[in-house]
Swiss-Prot record:
One of its GO terms (cellular component) is host cell plasma membrane. One of its GO terms (molecular function) is toxin activity. The gene is ptxD. This is Pertussis toxin subunit 4. Its main location: secreted.
Amino acid sequence: MLRRFPTRTTAPGQGGARRSRVRALAWLLASGAMTHLSPALADVPYVLVKTNMVVTSVAMKPYEVTPTRMLVCGIAAKLGAAASSPDAHVPFCFGKDLKRPGSSPMEVMLRAVFMQQRPLRMFLGPKQLTFEGKPALELIRMVECSGKQDCP
């Protein structure tokens, strides 16, 4: 089950988002979900829990060939892998046709980036992502509960 953290509605300069991020990351470490977290990852918008992969960058850009399509690209990094290892960094991209209904981009990303397409638990920091009008936390919950009978 995902643990939600309250987010403050303070101005960017007041440090509310940073306090929330630090509190959330401290919970991750204390819970044993992650044994090592690089200081560089403190500003990453989300961290995967119970896997050895973290998404280190994500960007959205228009697909030049078709203007009604967006591309979401990023890099997932394997914790503990040598930087020279071929599987240390996994680049990924997926597209979404803005005119057609279908799987959410977040669900596509979660299933495309990580091998074996197993359900994932994920922590989202104060930078809330929204895809197709749905908060990312709800999309993550949908992916996590995929195929389980104990999910609402």
